[in-house]
């Protein structure tokens, strides 16, 4: 039986590299992802337009994924959202400014209507299963 008090931290990108920021936190039956960024390809990656995090871990546990929290609106933190939300369509929490940036991006990809973007005001706390953010 798994220890339900153990916090698992799973980096899907952004460690030891510039860009592709995405960190997953898992506690019992709840998963929260922080950021969803892209990375621009290295020069030797001919024909590749952008690099996104491997979200297999999230897709395989979709029933446990409560949300994606966005720290700020830079591409290395929001750029992969149009690609990730196609398979992991969960609420996305962000500040008002970041909401505007994400909205434009999702509209360009024709995903704005089916996406669940939520604004978090300064000082506001949100409850996501066992997580408080």
Question: Where are the language model's segments positioned?
Answer:
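N-terminal Rossmann-fold NAD(P) dinucleotide-binding loop
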Residues: 77
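Pre-active-site segment of Zn-dependent metallo-hydrolases
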Residues: 15-20, 27-70, 82-90, 94, ...
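Short acidic-hydrophobic, aromatic-tinged amphipathic segments that line or gate anion-handling sites
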Residues: 116-122
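A short helix-to-beta-strand connector/capping loop
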Residues: 4-5, 111-116, 129-131
């Amino acid at each position: 039986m798994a220890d339900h008090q153990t916090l698992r931290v799973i980096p899907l990108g952004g460690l030891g590299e510039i860009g592709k920021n995405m960190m997953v936190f898992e506690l019992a039956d709840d998963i929260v992802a922080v950021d969803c960024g892209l990375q621009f390809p290295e020069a030797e990656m001919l024909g590749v337009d952008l690099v996104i995090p491997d979200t297999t871990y999230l897709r395989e546990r979709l029933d446990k994924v409560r949300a994606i929290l966005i720290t700020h609106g830079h591409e290395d933190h929001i750029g992969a959202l149009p690609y990730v939300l196609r398979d992991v369509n969960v609420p996305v929490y962000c500040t008002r400014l970041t909401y505007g940036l994400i909205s434009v991006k999702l509209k360009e990809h024709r995903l704005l209507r089916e996406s669940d973007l939520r604004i978090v005001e300064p000082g506001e706390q949100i409850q996501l299963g066992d997580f408080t953010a």
